[in-house]
């Protein structure tokens, strides 16, 4: 939930997991009850529930930990993009979480009364902070998991080595250790603990506890290709935030109403569609933003513009995460290998053409959109795939480096 959008996967994704693992518990119909149990959807509040359809009630929940609300801000430029997408053949939707994501509409968000709703607020504070068996260490870094070899040759995890910022301490496990440090830090911790590709571990002088070639391999990430269009005669965040008066208005609106740009998700409008008409399911996702910049961390442009980011939902490119030495303080080497397969390059080129097709629709004509990135002079597949890499960046969805799998999968860490 990096962008605090409330988003489930497509039912097809869960069904594929079940097929790949041989475990029917991953199927959509078996995951849906858990989604509903933990959801607290605004459309099922007492004031709104009468308007909710029976189909919606069967897909969503109320009273759970995760608050889901509609966004508290709309933009004319985003409304126009949504209309243009419909004119280009993408249907409208008011619910991306019904099992098929296809359509264009505003994302719903994990907020409560304009405040971001996160894991700490939803789970830790109400259920964990008062428990005698719960202790949270902050500003601490797990450096290694500790293991003992059993009589049958297997390894048993006995604890975790932790750097507190001042000293190294050991947390001993009485029952189990759950490693959940993300797609970058989980493989780093395992490799530092002697579990990973044997050649890599020996290269850095680490005792091989378990040769697991898959640890750190199979890195996958969503690459957002950020097409930027200059516009006229319409407000965007660029124009609002590039003046002291505009910044003051933004701050006051949030202070007084908990609405406005400070309450918004970075990407407010979304769309799921297909890069080719013969595909059975949507394979690309748009995040449309009423703003633009040269790169993350840089100032907004001083001209009005919007960004239509598009990403391949199922990339075939694979990367890796590997330690550079045996020091836990050293960041690992991350090689995402974006756009390294012909399929991913073709999807990238096709996605930029779909963006152009949407922007060329009548609904946006009044704002005179002008392609700023990648630039209308680039037309061939090769040019568009190359420029896609130049204007793209991670959308912070890395997965796959400590993957679960079937018992007979040699690259899985857990079978």
Language-model features: locations:
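Short acidic (Asp/Glu) and glycine-rich catalytic loops that position anionic groups and cofactors
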Residues: 10-14, 61-62, 325-334, 363-368
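Conserved redox-cofactor binding core of oxidoreductases
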Residues: 2, 19-149, 154-157, 226-251, ...
